[in-house]
Amino acid sequence: MTVSEIIERTGQSEVAILREHLLLTALSKRSRYEAECALFEKKYEQTLDDFQKRVNAQRREEDFTQEDDLLDWEFVDAALKWWQTQIEELHCAD
């Protein structure tokens, strides 16, 4: 069976199938990044904003683990926001 035959049997257009696939991928990514953010919040028992303030206030005392975690957490937070935007755009897309 070819891909074209499978698409035909679904009764959906190629665009609809692609949109659904993209949405499922985006939801999966969002879930992953939400879980990673939750791990950092649990580990440090504070929000990202509060953790940023704490790490930035400790300029004389370097804690490489916390600084690395801050960079990771900032990346994860940015990725979470980006995927959320993609989900919103996919919901609005034709």
Predicted feature locations:
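Short, glycine/alanine-rich amphipathic alpha-helical segment
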Residues: 57-72
